[in-house]
């Protein structure tokens, strides 16, 4: 081994496809906390989009019932288009869980 000689590791940022896949995994993983009967705050962003799609799948295939409270108009439109029942925060009163991202 050559002492004093450092081999620099090159850093390669993840590709857009890799980032999208990581966001999908994170969005789906967040849904592991979703339970039947919950009122769920639905955030906004590219990662939460995957969560909303997963929640719709859970409603349709697993038969869970939840109420979503969207944080934006775009989230409302997506959730409605996927058949997620929505209410306002005033109607729900208290959220059991909120799913949001950092983007």
Model segments located where?
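N-terminal nucleotide-binding beta1-loop-alpha1 segment
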Residues: 2-6
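N-terminal active-site beta-alpha-beta segment that forms phosphate/nucleotide-binding
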Residues: 7-102
């Amino acid at each position: 081994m050559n002492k004093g000689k450092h081999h620099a590791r090159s850093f390669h940022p993840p590709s857009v496809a890799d980032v999208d896949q990581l966001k999908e995994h994170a969005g789906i993983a967040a849904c592991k906390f979703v339970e039947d009967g919950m009122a769920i705050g639905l955030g906004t962003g590219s990662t939460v989009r995957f969560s909303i799609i997963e929640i719709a799948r859970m409603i349709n295939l697993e038969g869970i019932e939840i109420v979503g409270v969207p944080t934006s108009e775009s989230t409302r439109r997506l959730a409605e288009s996927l058949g997620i029942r929505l209410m306002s925060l005033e109607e729900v009163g208290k959220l059991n869980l909120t799913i949001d991202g950092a983007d």
